[in-house]
Amino acid sequence: MKTFLLLLLVLLELGQAPGALHRVPLSRRESLRKKLRAQGQLTELWKSQNLNMDQCSTIQSANEPLINYLDMEYFGTISIGSPPQNFTVIFDTGSSNLWVPSVYCTSPACQTHPVFHPSLSSTYREVGNSFSIQYGTGSLTGIIGADQVSVEGLTVVGQQFGESVQEPGKTFVHAEFDGILGLGYPSLAAGGVTPVFDNMMAQNLVALPMFSVYMSSNPGGSGSELTFGGYDPSHFSGSLNWVPVTKQAYWQIALDGIQVGDSVMFCSEGCQAIVDTGTSLITGPPGKIKQLQEALGATYVDEGYSVQCANLNMMLDVTFIINGVPYTLNPTAYTLLDFVDGMQVCSTGFEGLEIQPPAGPLWILGDVFIRQFYAVFDRGNNRVGLAPAVP
């Protein structure tokens, strides 16, 4: 018995309590930016969202800048109701609500995605409260309902979620995802809704109050997964660097500095960042990002900042120093490869985003960062664990 208890304590310390790991496969698909660029509609999006890409910034502040989702490529499947109705979602640590399209939605985006039918679910309960989430220059609005939500064998009972009845603009029409499942802290939730992971903890569905994210770098994304209830040491090398959460809303942490090459260029006296699976790129204050683009030799062309694909081996590394530990992105890691009219195009994975006080200014470490560094989100100790991801 003592041996078993000792083993259990060791496994708990490793984030691997017996039966703790519930793995949600994440598929990697073509990003919305690539789709719109191929259809010649990307410039139209910039104009519709009041975006000035030459300045790399959103002109208008928003609760959820729509630009964050342009390069999202990692998606998972959930089901809502009895019998289950399936939806493809972004698992987003930068927000806290779950929403999917409603059968009552008349927006163009709802015509191209699965919609939730409350009348077809025997476990559905009407809550009736309205909700609204600001995206760029438009709002996603709807009503709140409650039903059981299942994620790879974990079934949350009585989960309140948003049923969108209006989705802004034409952007979501082309998106690969139907909705968003937020994994941020409750303070971010619109309408005072309890987030899905909080209900998982309250209903004792996870052995440990943590989840982790592995995003594969290979084009097909095979092996990418979200893990509830712990973390998988096979996805990273070395030890996790545990970083305290500085504010319990986003998964917000402190940066000690940002190096370009061997020189500290930003945050020499420290600054704040969030680790965000719902943001595809790495973002920062627009002025800082413009300086960074210039230091990397990136030039502005049409719809963003590009670099010469042949020059990657001569470009500078970018290093984020977090809790005293350097996290270095080489040019191959922070550069996005695309094909336009049959030609290879390389762009940087950095974008300017103005986040106004009191929430900002903030840097956002999105998927470009998380692909290189395995991320563990520990609600029990309010900390984020980071370690080099195993390819």
From Swiss-Prot:
Keyword Hydrolase: yes
Keywords: Aspartyl protease, Autocatalytic cleavage, Disulfide bond, Endosome, Glycoprotein, Hydrolase, Protease, Signal, Zymogen
Annotated propeptide span(s): 20-53
One GO CC annotation: endosome
Modified how: Glycosylated. The nature of the carbohydrate chain varies between cell types.
Intracellular or extracellular location(s): Endosome
Enzyme Commission number(s) from the entry: 3.4.23.34
Protein's GO biological process: antigen processing and presentation of exogenous peptide antigen via MHC class II; proteolysis
Role according to the record: May have a role in immune function. Probably involved in the processing of antigenic peptides during MHC class II-mediated antigen presentation. May play a role in activation-induced lymphocyte depletion in the thymus, and in neuronal degeneration and glial cell activation in the brain.
Family, as annotated: Belongs to the peptidase A1 family.
Protein name: Cathepsin E
Organism: Cavia porcellus (Guinea pig)
Primary gene name: CTSE
